[in-house]
Structure formats: C-alpha cells, structure tokens
Amino acid sequence: TAFEEFLDFIKNAKEATSTSPSGRNYSHYKSLSQGDHCYLRTIHGILETALQHNIVLQRWKSTVTTLIEKDDGKPCIHRMRAIHIIESEVQFIAKLFYVRKLMRNAEKNNLITDEQYGGRNRRQAQTAVINKILYYNLSRQMRMTSAFIDIDARACYDRIVTSLSGLEGRKWGAPYKLSNFTTAFIESQEYKIRTGFGISKDTYEYSDAQPTQGSGQGIAWAGPRWINSSDTCSRIMRKYCAGVHYHDPCGGNEVRKCSDYFIDDTATAITQNTLQSDNDIFQQAQHDEQTHAYTLNAMGHRIENAKSGYYILHFVRDKILPSCGLIHEMEGSITIQEAFDSEPVVMKRLQPFQAHRTLGCHVAINGQSRRQFIVLKKKIQEWAT
C-alpha cells in the first residue's frame, strides 16, 4: 500500500462511522493528518509490515458485533442484523484491496457474470426487478409455460467459507499475501456482542472443532467476497441449468439467462423451450433449484426456505382469451434438500395473483399491481402523519 492511499482513506472517512473497538476512531486519524504526518507514516509502516509478513496485531484481534433490530420494536433473536466493528487500519486494507482494486480489476476484465447486480457500479436493484417484470410479461405474451423461483440465501455474509473465498479471490487477481492475511485475520478474531444493554464480557472465537466462518457484514471486504462466491454459483447454474430463452418472431434478437442475483436474493427462471431431457416444467424446476441448493451448500451457504417460493405460469382457456391458471388447474410440487444431509422440504408455491416481495417491490406473475399500490399507499400515509 502507498502512504498516499492511506491518507486518502483517512480524508474520505466519515467521523460518525463506528469503528475501532480500541477507541481509535477516525477523528484521531483526521487530527493526525493535520500535522507533519510523522505519526501516520509510522502507523502506515506498521500496517505495511503486518500485511507483508502475515502478522495480525493483538489490537486487531477484537471484533465487536453490534446487533440491530431488523424490525423496529421487535427484538427477536432471529431477526437481528449483525454488524462487525473492527479496527480502522484493517478496514483500510479491506476497502483499498477488495472494494477498489479487486472489484475494479474484475469489472475491467469482465470477470463477473452479467447476472450479478448487487455491489457493482452502474447496477441497481431496480434493474433486477424490471428484468423479472419483463420475463413475466414476455412469458404471458408468448403464452409460454414457465417457472419462476425466488430464493433467499440465509445470512450470506456470515456463512462464506474463509479458505474457499480466499482461493476465489485469487481468480480476480488478489495477491497471495492478501488472501493469506485475510484468512489469518478472520481466524484470529475474538468476538464480543453489543446490544442496547452494553458490550458482553463473554466472547467466542474460531477453533478447529467449531470454525467461525463468514467475512462479516460491516467489513468492506464482505461484499466483494460474497459477489465472488455468488459469481461462482451463477457460472455453475448457467452451465447445468435450463434458464430462459426469449426471442423476437424473426429470431434476430434473443435473451438467454438462468438467474439474476442481488446479494442474497436470487431469481431463477425456466421457460418451456429450454427444458432438458424430456423433463416437464416441475421436474426441470426441481433439477435447477436442487443444483442451486447443493452449490450454495458446498460453499457454506443455505437456502432460507421460509423466504423462498415459486410460480408456475401456465394458461387455461377462459371464454376467448387464455388466462393464468391457478394451482389446482396444474398440480405439482417441488421438493429440495437445503443441504446434502438434510431432509427434503416442499417449496412454497404461489398463486398467479399472489404478489411476492422482491427487493422491496411486490410483483405478481399475472401482472396485477394491486398489492404494490396498497403498500405504497400505506407508506405514504405513514410519511404524511
């Protein structure tokens, strides 16, 4: 790292951002930057030596995990967002190498598949939602039987396998010393929990018997490392799964895609014209989603079945125009194993008029927007009061 990069990090850091369990927050570093920089040069020299020789300082081994309610006023233990607070020097390493250098190198050399929308420049959550609406519309216009599956990966940042993610980072150009340091840092952490009642006295840490995995939400390298794992998953899905195929009547313009990914949310789709090995739409959907579940599990992750669901779009004649068929008009089910050693579970199937919440939007496969307008009206009324 260059000293100028360290200075630039300090200059752009927000003083209100929580950091450094030791108490060395960004305000201290900004004050030091006003002088002759001799102390900052010493700190940067220590930082550079630690990175080059894979040394994790004792002060860096403490992480405070702050638990924030996902639902205001409902402090349920399974509905807490865990944010890791680490020392600011390590946050500098994470932002410089993973966010700036690795992500930029991956984008420049087209190392990330087009299916990835989260954590990338010039990509938005709205694009993934619009894609889904367009898939729904095209399938309805072409009267093509289709399956659309929405999957949520459980606590994705906290289940990244550290050693595997280090290897995946190498394909994006991560230096060996960086991958080695990141692994050593994660495995050396002693975690404390902070809630509204204070910081816990008891701690938990990595051990060979119970290895603590995950890159930790709140640390700058968590996003790029998850995109790396998710990108591996999307490449496997694209190779072995059916996906969708839409084209114009002349065949001059076409779209072939398997899934769209936004962080932990995955939207998988299958159309009638891509079915493999004489499968029907249910068999193909089960094959593709089981491939997805096994791939995630092999990388340390797991599907959140309670937040997942699927549609089967099919058509029945109603007087003159065909309409989207209900569940009882085309019976079938999809069962998947969330992990290699788990029991099969039946996935939740949705009626065509039921809106599924996708990245904050409520979209129904039959094109109905009633649920979305109800939610928007409620939000507007809350803002107005």
What does each of the following model-derived ranges do?
Residues 189, 193, 197, 302-354:
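Short, conserved micro-motifs composed of acidic
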Residues 155-173, 255-262, 266-295, 314-325, ...:
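Catalytic palm subdomain of template-directed nucleic-acid polymerases
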Residues 20, 62-65, 81, 116-119, ...:
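Catalytic palm active-site di-aspartate
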Residues 228-239, 245:
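Helical scaffold of the NTase/Pol beta-like nucleotidyltransferase catalytic core
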Residues 339-385:
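Basic, alpha-helical interaction scaffolds
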Residues 1-232:
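Conserved pre-catalytic core of RNA-dependent polymerases
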Residues 78-83, 203-216, 248-260, 278-291, ...:
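Glycine-rich, flexible loop segments associated with nucleotide phosphate handling
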Residues 39-50, 54, 97-105, 128-140, ...:
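Inter-domain linker/hinge segments that demarcate the starts of reverse transcriptase
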